[in-house]
């Protein structure tokens, strides 16, 4: 099951938090979902070259707060924050509500699965060999401290007549382990031969609750030697 399902959705509430944080009612649930989709689509298209790894949407009774995590926040902020004000006005015109925008820097861009997938897509669109692009992303993730990475590309690779799927795996990526912190990203490369899909899984380590120790089984515990009976004097 872990090989098929989205690893982020499988771990929500375990070691991953929701990217849309609000409590809906039946009356406004569809409206809020539509607004979140518009916000994410708009920001992804407008700020693509800023390297966006995550977009968080939080709602209160009257306000809406959007947090953008980007590898190059300077492109979004601009000189003295002028570009942020323009972006805020565009979002307010898009959804018709007051919006607050926070910009955060992605400190370990190499360990972000979404940025890695977009990097491979950009290289494929520039006609770089897919194997070279995949290995470059894997090396960047390893330098950033990732414990494992898997990259999969699918489509007409190298302009071949028949579509196929190829993947590389370095380290370990335990998709079945729920306590494993795994980041997942997907992107598409639009080439002259058609679209190529890129999927990236990055394993960042296991997360255990504080104070919880793994149970010791009888096999793992060292065997105790039987005590010798004492002889009476």
Swiss-Prot record:
Superkingdom in the source lineage: Bacteria
Pfam families: KH_2, Ribosomal_S3_C
Amino acid composition bias (Basic and acidic residues), ranges on this chain: 213-222
SUPFAM superfamilies associated with the record: Prokaryotic type KH domain (KH-domain type II) (SSF54814), Ribosomal protein S3 C-terminal domain (SSF54821)
Keyword Ribonucleoprotein set for record: yes
Alphabetically ordered keywords of this record: Ribonucleoprotein, Ribosomal protein, RNA-binding, rRNA-binding
One Gene Ontology term, aspect cellular component: cytosolic small ribosomal subunit
PANTHER family linked to this entry: 30S/40S RIBOSOMAL PROTEIN S3, SMALL RIBOSOMAL SUBUNIT PROTEIN US3C
Oligomeric form and interacting partners: Part of the 30S ribosomal subunit. Forms a tight complex with proteins S10 and S14.
Entry protein name: Small ribosomal subunit protein uS3
The species this protein was found in: Campylobacter lari (strain RM2100 / D67 / ATCC BAA-1060)
């Amino acid at each position: 099951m872990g090989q098929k399902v989205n690893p982020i959705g499988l771990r929500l509430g375990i070691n991953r938090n929701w990217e849309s944080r609000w409590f809906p009612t039946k009356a406004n649930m569809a409206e809020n979902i539509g607004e979140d989709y518009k916000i994410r689509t708009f920001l992804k298209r407008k700020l693509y070259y800023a390297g966006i790894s995550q977009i968080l949407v939080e709602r209160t009774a009257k306000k809406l707060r959007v947090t953008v995590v980007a590898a190059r926040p300077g492109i979004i902020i601009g000189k003295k924050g002028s570009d942020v004000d323009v972006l805020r006005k565009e979002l307010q015109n898009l959804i018709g509500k007051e919006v607050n925008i926070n910009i955060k820097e992605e400190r370990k861009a190499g360990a972000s699965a979404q940025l890695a997938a977009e990097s491979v897509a950009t290289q494929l669109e520039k006609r770089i060999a897919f194997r070279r692009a995949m290995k470059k992303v894997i090396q960047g993730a390893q330098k950033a401290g990732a414990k494992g990475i898997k990259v999969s590309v699918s489509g007409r690779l190298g302009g071949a007549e028949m579509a196929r799927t190829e993947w590389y795996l370095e380290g370990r990526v335990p998709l079945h382990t729920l306590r494993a912190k795994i980041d997942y990203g997907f992107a598409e490369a639009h080439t002259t031969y058609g679209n190529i899909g890129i999927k990236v899984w990055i394993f960042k380590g296991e997360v255990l609750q504080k104070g919880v120790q793994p149970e010791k089984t009888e096999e793992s515990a060292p065997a105790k030697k039987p005590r010798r009976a004492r002889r009476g004097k």
